[in-house]
Amino acid sequence: WREELELAQSYLSIEKYRLGERLQLEWQVDEVPGGLLIPQLTLQPLLENALIHGIQPRIDGGLVRVEGRYRDGVFELCVSNPYDPGAEDKPSRGTHQALLNIEARLGAIFGPQARLIVERRDGRHFSCLRYPCASLPQEA
């Protein structure tokens, strides 16, 4: 998890430079052990989707929130961004390939209990993953 988080933060530092004040970030990941297993390039594509579909189209930008927790052997991670209900009328340019790829990799590694859930509620778009896994011991 630590390496995945560092990669995501590096990516966002570039996007923050590009988008400026339009991109607001909120991280709630303190409960996630640094050694937790997560496939490489899982978080970054979720963040990229949040920026492309939730921040870039909005003149005022918005808040991307990353929430992660590890409890009772289950890891949950949600990336959310602003969602405009009127956007459903516009044709999507995306192929959902990143989400399909993440879902397939989670299933292959963590089995049928692994889930990727995408939903819209309360003016936000949520991409959430949940899977059982063992946490590696924290390094001193």
Predicted regions and their residues:
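Two-component histidine phosphotransfer core
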Residues: 1-119, 124-126
